[in-house]
Amino acid sequence: NKPKDTVTTSDDPQARRTVMDLVKGACNERIYPVGRLDRNTTGVLLLTNDGDLASKLTHPKYLKKKIYHVHLDKNLTKADMEQIAAGIQLDDGEIHADAISYTDDVKKDDVGIEIHSGKNRIVRRIFESLGYKVMKLDRVYFAGLTKKGLRRGEWRYLTEQEVNFLRMGSFE
């Protein structure tokens, strides 16, 4: 469960805290992050020593499901929500959410968004393109995995069943 102010890299030339610092001594094999979460994004991040699995989970053709909880600087209008679902044009092409909804009936500045794209900073760019500022971004689901039971900065080993599901592609 990646905390804020942690860089998703194996080695940072600026000597900032990295996700590798969180798992120091976890195993003898060389492990590395699967995909990226920017420094201020929190949540589910997978680390592995299996290059084939990492490739399968990050390659665009496999379209792995990611769900984020987004806290915005202001209420998201229904019209903007519908536009995100229908698709918006960004500098690097069109993107649409597979699902988007308010996480609370009252607070319209908290949103859940499901996407399959792995483009860099895609969730932030979606909302920024419509004039919103993302105040907090938390990935709550990635390729069948959640952060349930883990506090920020904590990690756990995957179960044998989870590893098998990931290897077989038995996840969204």
Feature map (PLM): residue ranges:
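Basic, flexible Lys/Arg- and Gly-enriched helix-loop patches that mediate nucleic-acid binding at interfaces
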Residues: 2-172
